[in-house]
């Protein structure tokens, strides 16, 4: 198999789309990052793109926006993941992707480099195409603005520390600023006399968009705010798209149940793996 390094995100998307759109939900992260690289190149200071070609079709794909982890697609031919691990010469901090392809790449990379893979986050990937409405929750949804920036940065960092159990590669202020200014991203807040919860969205795919993070401070929990916020935001996004995606922490069964009640269904598991 031939592993090719590409430099043009538009060319990468055009070539990889037949593979990626076979399972749009599974590949929403790669599709969203590649679209951002194409449409808003200033958001990422650097990028690396790879395709695996078996002579007949694109059999595998991967991308990285340093210093973030590599993202891998599910291959359509045996050996594509291993070919990527063999041919990529750049140093990698880790790999993100659906299971089992992320695990397979981590194993191949460990065999090549001697580094030890360690799973830092086990996730469930969920998809929604119709919302089950939530009632009986006080408050209203509104779009966040620059006047909410400091609060959103505080909440974003709190989410990272609580849910991811480690510092994020992307600083909270950078993440918030991007979503407040990007064309196909945004942040919404649930107000109940005061701001009580927030959700962000972005990473557009041809037919969908990803929601996350969703965060409610501890003092405002167990009142249904996150459920109402996610349901209302999902409904709004489905006015212009067919699908919504989100990732959940598999160690938090409460949040998984909340999303299922709204109408999200689990597509697959995903993992973030670092190389020690």
List where the protein language model places each region.
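Acyl-donor-binding surface of acyltransferase catalytic domains
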Residues: 54-138, 273
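Active-site rim helix/loop that mediates acceptor-substrate recognition in acyltransferases
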Residues: 26-46, 164-191, 195, 200
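Conserved acetyl-CoA-binding loop-helix of GNAT-fold acetyltransferases
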Residues: 77-87, 212, 216-218, 222-238, ...
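Short amphipathic alpha-helix that is part of the acyltransferase structural core
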Residues: 1-30, 131-167
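Conserved donor-binding loop and adjoining core beta-sheet/short helix segment
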Residues: 3-9, 18-24, 31-94, 196-209
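Conserved acetyl-CoA-binding loop of GNAT-fold acetyltransferases
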Residues: 111-117, 260-269
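Recognition helices and adjacent regulatory flanks at domain boundaries
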Residues: 189-191, 202-204, 223-236, 247-249, ...
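Conserved beta-strand-loop-alpha-helix junction that forms the acyl-donor binding cleft
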Residues: 96-102, 246-256, 273-276
């Amino acid at each position: 198999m031939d592993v090719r390094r590409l430099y043009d995100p538009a060319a990468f998307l055009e070539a990889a789309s037949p593979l990626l759109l076979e399972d749009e939900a599974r590949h929403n992260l790669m599709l969203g990052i590649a679209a951002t690289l194409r449409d808003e190149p200033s958001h990422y200071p650097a990028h690396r793109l790879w395709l695996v070609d078996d002579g007949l079709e694109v059999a595998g794909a991967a991308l990285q926006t340093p210093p973030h982890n590599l993202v891998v697609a599910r291959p359509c031919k045996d050996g594509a993941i291993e070919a990527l691990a063999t041919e990529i010469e750049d140093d990698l901090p880790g790999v993100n992707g659906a299971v089992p392809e992320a695990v397979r790449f981590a194993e191949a990379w460990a065999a090549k480099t001697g580094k030890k893979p360690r799973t830092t986050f086990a996730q469930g990937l969920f998809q929604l195409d119709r919302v089950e409405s939530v009632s009986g929750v006080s408050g209203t949804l509104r779009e966040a603005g620059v006047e909410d920036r400091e609060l959103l940065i505080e909440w974003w960092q709190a989410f990272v520390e609580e849910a991811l159990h480690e510092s994020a590669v992307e600083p909270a202020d950078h993440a918030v600023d991007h979503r407040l200014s990007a064309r196909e991203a945004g942040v919404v807040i649930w107000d109940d006399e005061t701001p009580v919860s927030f959700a962000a969205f972005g990473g557009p795919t041809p037919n969908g968009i990803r929601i996350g993070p969703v965060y409610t401070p501890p003092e405002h929990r167990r009142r249904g705010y996150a459920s109402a916020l996610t349901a209302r935001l999902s409904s709004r996004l489905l006015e212009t798209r067919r699908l919504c995606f989100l990732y959940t922490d598999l160690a938090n069964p409460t949040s998984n149940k909340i999303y299922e009640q709204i109408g999200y269904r689990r597509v697959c598991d995903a993992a973030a793996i670092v190389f020690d």
